Amino acid sequence: MNKTCARCQKVVYPIEELKCLDKTWHKTCFKCTECGMTLNMKTYKGYNKMPYCEAHIPKAKATAIADTPELKRIAENTKIQSNVKYHADFEKAKGKFTQVADDPETLRIKQNTKHISNVAYHGDLEKKAAMEKQRGSAEVSDSSNESEYFSEQLAAEQFSQYAPTASPIPPAATTLHQQQQQLQHQQQQQYQQHQQQLQQQQHQHQHYLQQQQQTLPPPPIQHQQYNTAAITPTYQQLQQQQQQQQQQRAQQQQLHDPYAHYQQPQALRQQQQQQQQQQQQLLQQQAIKQASHLYPTATSQQQQMPPPQSPANPQQQALNSYNEMRSAILQNSHHPSGNSVDQYDQPQQQQHQPQQQSTNPTLVAAQQQQSHHSLLNNNASNGGISHSHHSNINNNGHGSQNQMLPPQMRRSAASVVAYDGNSKQQVAAGPGAAQNHLQQLYASPNYAAVTPSENSINVKQHASNGHMPNQQQQHVAGGSNIGKIADYDPLTDGPRVVPNAGRSSTTLVYSSEPRGNQGGNSVYPKRIGSVSDIDPANGIYGSLTAAEQAHQQQKHQQYYQQVQMMQQQEHPPQQQQMRQQPSYSSLQEKQSRQSTAMRVYRAIYDYEAQDVDEVSFREGDVIFEVESIDSGWMTGRVERTGKTGMLPANYVEQAVI
């Protein structure tokens, strides 16, 4: 079938056929619709599937419309996405500069250029130049003279090694040498002044110590030693002060004259070093003398120790006891191991021993043990016992024997022996009872734990005409051997009981002990079972034994019988005959209802109802008529609101009534 031309409607043969704009044309018929100019495939413009030339093609005219935010957004997106702006900038930049990829070298040059331009812009170079000009010209001239002299002096020293004659010192060198001598003279004066100040301080300190020795009674040598050690500077502190002074002098010399070391001849430098060494040796000898004077040796301590004087009056006695306690505290504070020996305790113990041996020979051992105990526990943190109890004497002349006992014995004696203030007679349960009580106290290897507060309590028992029985004193003296850790043998002694364990700190959940061993310790009537025995409706989450269940059933039956008797008394006998007896099943139902009615629970958490058939309650609410309906759920009536519904079993616990 032959095709027809879109313009002339004639047959188009293949030789002159032209296909364009979805139509078939003769080559001569393919012309502009407006002007009739012949077109080809390169010059035509199509509009409405008709050919037009460039000049006559219909063009869209701009129409004024309202500018809305949506149109603005679209125009902005179009501008960003199109390449029109990029091409326009590219065309403008042609011939002006060339774009180059950034590399590290280019970036470094760019950064340096930026710094240079900033410095030039802010005028930092001019500011630095002005500051340099404002500095003193004298310093600049001095530095130049020093540099010139430094170079000349080095050359002269090198030449003097080979030539016998010495080069004359230039005038600048003479002035510098004079300045150096002046500095040395000033430093020597400062050093002498410092030495004089140190001597004055030492003299004042010695004068102060002499005044103290004249006014106060002679304290122990160790006490004086520790006090002076805290006041006077030690040998190490003197060495540190000397080193600091030498460093300061060296820094001053370097600041005033940095080239002084090279300007001095070698002989002069050696003399200065020898002088410094001699001064250091003198200072060390002085410090050693002071230390030996302030810290005497053991032999000098023994020579200087005054003999113990017997107290003449009560005031001197109290003062001596105070000094003894103070020296013992200081001694134990410097000897933390507790192996020190109290100097002033031994003569007093020797004075007390013959008196007590004449009255009661068995009490001497207790007194010796007490003195050893007081030496070991003399610090304030251990609840120490003051030594002043040696001077406490009652009316009969006997020492207060209860105070010479260890703290445990003192408390036991205080609990057994009592004194009546009115009759002033000793009231006790008898020597046998006291002895039994003390035997119970010291029978077990574990003593009662003694806290520092209990140990520091001074139990004073004064009697005008009485003292402790001899049997009790003998037992106290014999049973005061406190055990050590080394004496404990775990194989033979067995486990020890923890002292002062009033109650166990943990709650027993599962135990292998039988029911009878627990006794009255168990609060709830339950036995220890496994996790599978847990019943949420059982209240205390533990299965009851068969005997307890039978006991509860018996109680329920008795309660049911009582209710039935009351009902029979209320109703006439005719109605009782007409009424049928309840069956066994109905009796069981009533019994179960009564058991649930008797079961009372208390809420341990707040709960909000999540469904219609649930009930809300608050912590502490009482819940009655509880029945277990499912695993973890039960029904009950809240007493506060009166509502009945389902509630979670783990939110409540059985109330103990």
Curated annotation (Swiss-Prot):
Residues 3-63 form the LIM zinc-binding domain. The keyword Zinc applies. One of its GO terms (cellular component) is A band. It comes from the Eukaryota. One of its GO terms (molecular function) is actin binding. One of its GO terms (biological process) is positive regulation of pole plasm oskar mRNA localization. Residues 130-151, 164-223, 235-257, 294-318, 332-415, 460-528, 548-592 are annotated as: Disordered. Keywords: LIM domain, Metal-binding, Phosphoprotein, Repeat, SH3 domain, Zinc. Coiled coil: none annotated. SUPFAM superfamilies: Glucocorticoid receptor-like (DNA-binding domain), SH3-domain. The modification Phosphoserine is found at S505, S530. Residues 172-215, 236-254, 342-357, 371-403, 549-586 have a biased composition (Low complexity). Residues 140-150, 332-341, 358-370, 460-475 have a biased composition (Polar residues). Nebulin repeats lie at residues 64-95, 96-130. Residues 596-657 form the SH3 domain. Interacts with osk. This is LIM and SH3 domain protein Lasp. The gene is Lasp.
